Swiss-Prot record:
Record flagged with keyword Secreted: yes
Cellular localisation: Secreted
Organism: Chrysolophus pictus (Golden pheasant)
Major localization listed first in the record, in broad terms: secreted
Protein name listed in UniProt: Ovomucoid
């Protein structure tokens, strides 16, 4: 099983678009898009990871 990852090096960003491209985090929460997910990754100090693309 290949690990899926997202490059969050440009984050955090102060505002995210409303674009809906869901990602499922390691906390089993569905994030609406990469921006929302990456902001959460930064807030978690890198403990949050990507489970898979799409809804959880």
């Amino acid at each position: 099983l290949a690990a899926v990852s997202v490059d969050c090096s440009e984050y955090p960003k102060p505002a995210c678009t409303m674009e809906y491209r869901p990602l499922c985090g390691s906390d089993n929460k569905t994030y609406g898009n990469k921006c929302n997910f990456c902001n959460a990754v930064v807030e978690s100090n890198g403990t949050l990871t990507l489970n898979h693309f799409g809804k959880c």
